[in-house]
A protein has these predicted regions:
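Membrane-interface helix-loop junction between the first two transmembrane segments
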Residues: 32-41, 283-294, 327-343, 372-375
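Membrane-interface transmembrane-helix boundary segments in multi-pass integral membrane proteins
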Residues: 258-262, 331, 424, 542-552, ...
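N-terminal signal-anchor module of multipass membrane proteins
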Residues: 291-362, 366, 703, 707, ...
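Alpha-helical transmembrane segments
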Residues: 270-284, 325, 367-368, 440-441, ...
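Membrane helical hairpin/interfacial module
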Residues: 344-408, 425-432, 436
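Long, contiguous internal "core" modules enriched in hydrophobic/ aromatic residues
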Residues: 292-324, 377, 415, 419, ...
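Non-ligating segments of multi-cofactor redox enzymes
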Residues: 1-292
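TerminUS-proximal long segments
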Residues: 469, 639, 643-728
Length: 728
């Protein structure tokens, strides 16, 4: 929200660093007004008068101590005291990040927080360019803490008496104005803090600079930085020497606004395009099938292998370890059970989710390839891809429950209407996609256990469900009735045109929904990091990062389908259909090629190759591109190489690991974690035993349940089963 778009005056505080005497009266007043406990402090020689070291859940305002060079001062140095607190951006990144409007900007300036709406995702902590929000890690239900610009003081009722004497109307208003002033400003004895409208504070700042050019640098920090803030600074030394980050004028939420604003029309466009592709390819394939009398019928049956094997017992032990870790996370609390901190609010579990979602993309890729593009030669691996996708996304949801600080507030995702929140889009999109995966897989148990009526109902009504689900998604994301109606028309028309006319009808609407929703959430996982150009290295950050995430997921998901099919053949001693896998490898080749060309082309257009290969991050980037991209691209480049099982395995493994490494770099390795304002103390991060336990347990559960489902239901083709001896 720009100043021009504001509905009225913006309440603003001007901080004059040149006048601050470091008394910390503001710091004490802030604690008193917000009823925050004191915290144990330590004398640290490099911090001087600064105590505590950083902002925290109990310290919203902090006076930071700086020693700056000044040849004219005794000893060649002078002290500068800087008030650190929330800057209350005019276009706050934390508000753009919040998926539930727990963080929201008031029309007159303050960025406020409502704990009752917070789900504890901590995305705001990473998104804030000033590193202000903190979590109460000592609590079993860690909430976000930050300065609210004393917005609650304005809500205080008008006083009607003072010291037992009734007040006149003018006196009451004067006292009310005094109360409404932020506690820190009221406590300042040195004319270092002023409070008023933004226009008044800018005028006063310019007056002071003009009156004393020898005392101030000609820069009002916060006037234009990232679109402007409601807290402005004056200083006698350059702000960079005081640790202030150097930012341009463009607010970071502008990046996500562009990306997420394209989602509603993209949903309609992708759905319509997929419907057109299906109509074209179905007609062409039908003609070929009628001429050859080959309609590609494939039979499935349960795997005839014993469940009690050493391998499965190991999986059960790991699952028990994961279950114990999951319970421990809630008994101990998020802070005590993990090594997460204000420096690293996201850790192994978020990394785990981003990697898992990327490599599980094979489910939507195979659905689109088999049904939309009518590749019936790949129909035999469709069920395994969908089952693995269903299990993977289900356990991603479990991981998110463990990672959320307040998971019992998740219902707020259905009640709030945040503006341009990538987290909100991902949450709804993934949730709806899980239901699509479930509907795609349900015909398998229905066929196994003879639920013919349920199967008929699913076949008849899945199109209507898809139209309703996608329309709901578009409305929730845009809050635009026109977009919602247009989406209903597009997907309703597709559902009617492709409605089931017999028992052999294809679930094309589910396939269209799978591809559409996956396109949106795979790309929006990249949108999560559009708010962090100040943290993510330029080799990975890009305004088109969402497209890069989507393209790379296709390559990784397709490659994982190959690895799973090879694992099935090896683990259960099944025949390996190299012809079929070579065809999947060809899809992986083109997906990987498009991804690499797009990503490297984007870097070239933005001029990011200069220095891209230098330093440790340069080596990481080179390894990701070379080993995870170019090498598998070469190995998948020809049919002869793809039909060699060993080379196909290596190429697929490298492609999966390359995309996984890309997500690791984006989440952790290529990020600059500075800690909380004023960036003097940054903790290290090593995942705890509980974090590892939950992650390992869920991986084991995925593998075990996949094997269990294959034994109980017709997941594998009849050609893949037989009387071969059990391997494991």
């Amino acid at each position: 929200m720009s100043e021009a778009a504001a509905t009225g005056p913006i309440r603003t505080t001007l901080i004059d660093i040149a006048n601050c005497i470091g008394c910390r009266a503001c710091q004490v007043a802030c604690k008193q007004w917000n009823e925050k406990d004191g915290e144990q402090t330590f004398l640290e020689s490099d911090l001087g008068f600064q105590n505590p070291a950083t902002l925290s859940a109990r310290t919203y305002t902090l006076i930071a101590f700086h020693e700056v060079e000044n040849p004219a001062s005794p000893g060649g140095a002078e002290s500068a005291f800087v008030m650190q607190r929330c800057l209350h951006c005019l276009e706050p990144a934390c508000v753009s990040a919040c998926p539930t409007t727990a963080l929201h900007r008031q029309a007159d300036g303050p960025v406020s927080y409502d704990a009752d709406e917070c789900i504890g995702c901590r995305y705001c902590q990473l998104a804030c360019p000033w590193d202000v929000p903190t979590s109460d890690w000592n609590s079993h239900a860690p909430k976000i803490s930050k300065c609210t610009h004393c917005a609650d003081r304005i809500e205080q009722p008008l006083p009607i008496a003072f010291n037992g004497q009734a007040l006149s109307g003018d006196e009451s208003k004067r006292f009310s104005g005094s109360i409404a002033t932020p506690a820190c400003v009221k406590a300042c004895p040195a004319d270092a803090l002023l409070y008023g409208t933004r226009e008044e504070m800018l005028t006063e700042a310019r007056r002071r600079i003009a009156a004393r050019p020898d005392k101030y640098v000609d820069h009002i920090y916060g006037e234009k930085e990232l679109g402007g803030t409601s807290v402005l600074y004056l200083s006698r030394v350059p702000f960079a020497k005081l640790g202030f980050p150097t930012y341009g004028e463009k607010p970071f939420p502008a990046f996500t606004k562009t990306a997420l604003g394209a989602v509603p029309p993209a949903v309609m466009a992708v759905g319509a395009m997929l419907g057109a592709f299906y109509a074209f390819f179905r007609k062409r394939v039908q003609k070929v099938a009628d001429a050859s009398h080959d309609h590609g019928h494939v039979e499935f049956e349960p795997l005839q292998h014993a469940l009690s094997t050493p391998f499965n017992w190991v999986l059960l032990v790991l699952m028990a370890f994961g279950a114990i870790s999951f319970v421990a996370r809630f008994i101990m609390g998020l802070g005590a059970s993990t090594n997460l901190s204000d420096t690293y609010p996201w850790g192994l579990w978020i990394l785990f989710d981003l990697v898992w979602i990327a490599v599980a993309a094979g489910a939507f890729v195979m659905a689109g390839v088999i049904y939309v593009f009518q590749r019936k030669d790949l129909y035999g691996i469709g069920r395994t891809a969908v089952l693995m996708g269903l299990l993977s996304y289900s356990f991603v949801t479990v991981t998110l429950i463990a990672d959320l600080g307040l998971p019992w507030h998740a219902y707020q995702l259905a009640l709030q209407a945040p503006e341009h929140s990538a987290m909100f889009e991902v949450s709804w999109c993934v949730g709806l996609y899980v239901t699509i995966l479930l509907l795609e897989f349900l015909p398998v148990p229905f066929a196994r256990y003879g639920y013919t009526r349920a199967a008929d109902a699913l076949r008849q009504w899945n199109g209507a469900y898809v139209a309703a689900a996608v329309t709901l998604f578009v409305y929730l994301l845009s809050r635009n009735v026109f977009y919602a109606l247009a989406t209903a028309v597009v997907f309703g028309t597709l559902a009617w045109v492709f409605r089931a006319r017999d028992h052999h009808a294809e679930p094309v609407m589910l396939a269209i929904a799978a591809v559409t929703l996956s396109t949106m959430h795979q790309s929006s996982l990249g949108s999560l990091y559009l708010l962090m150009p100040n943290m993510l290295a330029p080799q990975w950050w890009s305004p088109v990062l969402p497209i890069s995430f989507f393209l790379s997921s296709i390559a990784a998901g397709t490659a994982l389908v190959i690895l799973i099919d090879m694992w099935i053949a090896k683990g259960w001693r099944r025949p390996l259909d190299l012809t079929r896998l070579a065809s999947v490898g060809q899809i992986a080749f083109w997906a990987l090629l498009v991804y690499l060309v797009f990503r490297l082309g984007d870097m070239a257009v933005r001029g990011q190759f200069n220095g891209a290969f230098s330093g440790s991050l340069g080596l990481a980037f080179a390894a990701e591109i070379l080993l995870g991209g170019i090498v598998p691209l070469i190995l998948l480049g020809t049919r002869a190489l793809r039909k060699r099982a060993d080379l196909l395995f290596i190429a697929s493994l490298l492609a999966v690991l390359g995309v996984a490494y890309n997500r690791m770099n984006v989440v952790l390795f290529a990020m600059t974690f500075r800690g909380r304002m004023p960036w003097d103390v940054a903790e290290n991060y090593v995942p705890s035993i509980v974090e590892w336990g939950v992650s390992i347990g869920l991986i084991a559960a995925t593998i075990f349940l996949f094997g269990l489902a294959a034994r109980l239901m017709p997941v594998l083709t009849r050609a893949q089963t037989g009387d071969a001896a059990l391997s494991r």
